[in-house]
Amino acid sequence: MISTTDYPTVETTTTAEELYAEYISAPASSMSPAAIAEHLQQNQITFEIPSAHDLRHIDALNSFNALLQRIGNAAVSYDPAPPSGWSPDGSISTEQLSKSVVLDLADLRDRSEESGESSWWSQIFGDADMHVIINYLWIGVVSSLVILSLVFILFSCYFYRKFRTWKKCNKDIRAQIHAASDSYSSHLVGCDASRLLLHQQMQHPHHRSSEAGFYQIESPPCYTIATGLPSYDEALHHQPRHFAYGMKFVYPSLAAVHHHHHCISNWEKQEPLNKLQKCKLSAAAAVEEDKADSSSSTSASASPSSSESSNLATATPAICINMPSGRQDEEVDNSDSDSAIAVAVAVAQSLQPAAPADDDCASLVVVVAA
């Protein structure tokens, strides 16, 4: 609001007519100029000029007042028993609207302030201290983390126990299958496999029965990382089918160079049966020519030519190569796998230090241990 004076507004109960009459009745001689000025200052009338914003606000209130009057009159006209305090003709007066809660601006302002103070924060926590609230929040967060950690640990222990049970069960089943059919071996550490073995014995005593029993073992749990991956023994079992061209898996393998005196001693024992000496003469062409001459000559000259060829053979140095016979190769090819493994283990236990580079008896031996 715009004010025309800086003096404070003085509230008085006297009207303008009374002040004017008092001023006229007082004689001019009885009042000094200071008293007259003080009297005028005390009885000064001030007024305020409304601004454009105030005028728009007043117009809006008048429009809203008229709207409420129309709505109220329409509602009261349909009500046969109007409430007390209404006019006899059933219309809403301006005084009633001014006294209502809707147009009481002071009441609306107080309500807005109260609603601002009574927010959702104050409704939930009330007058609690902020430090106490933060402490409670931290306690809740830590408690939730502890509970989640305990649940995770319990589930981890449960799944690990199930995995160990499955592993132990498969180990016992594979051990019993290996003892029954000697087809599979396991490197895993009870589980009752009597029903599985009984079902296996009722089938045909063939290699396929042990294979079927092997594949009836419980599969890995779905929560392990080994799902879908074959075991080492299973991979070795299927190896000949997928790699039928001589590819072979050996585990573990040991390669060492050692002295050959053990093999030489065994070789010398069976020398008359397992060895064949083949000698080649350096002058083979001359021998063939002598044989051709001896065949074309007479029987009289046969003895001198034969003696001459024998003398040539004795005069020429022979190169002899020791080679194993074909019988030994057949025996090695037809030997049993168990005896070969036993011999390999025996040779592995009797390994000697490596022979020097110029040793003719040194050989490379690859030992395969099951």
From Swiss-Prot:
Subcellular location: Cytoplasmic vesicle membrane; Cell membrane
Segments in the Cytoplasmic topological domain: 158-370
Residue numbers covered by motif PY-motif 2: 229-232
Motif position, PY-motif 1: 220-223
PTM remark: Ubiquitinated by Nedd4; which promotes endocytosis of the comm/robo complex and comm proteasomal degradation. Not ubiquitinated by Nedd4.
Stretch list, region Disordered: 287-312
Any single GO BP term: axon midline choice point recognition
Ranges for region Required for vesicular localization: 108-131
Keywords assigned: Cell membrane, Cytoplasmic vesicle, Developmental protein, Membrane, Transmembrane, Transmembrane helix, Ubl conjugation
Effect noted on mutating P221A: Abolishes interaction with Nedd4, ubiquitination and internalization
Residues in compartment: Extracellular: 1-136
Chain spans, region Interaction with Nedd4: 227-237
Function text: Controls axon guidance across the CNS midline by preventing the delivery of Robo to the growth cone.
Assembly: Interacts (probably via PY-motifs) with Nedd4 (via WW2 domain). Interacts with Robo.
Family in the record: Belongs to the commissureless family.
Domain description: The cytoplasmic domain is required for function in axon guidance.
Protein name per Swiss-Prot or TrEMBL: Protein commissureless 1
Organism of provenance: Drosophila melanogaster
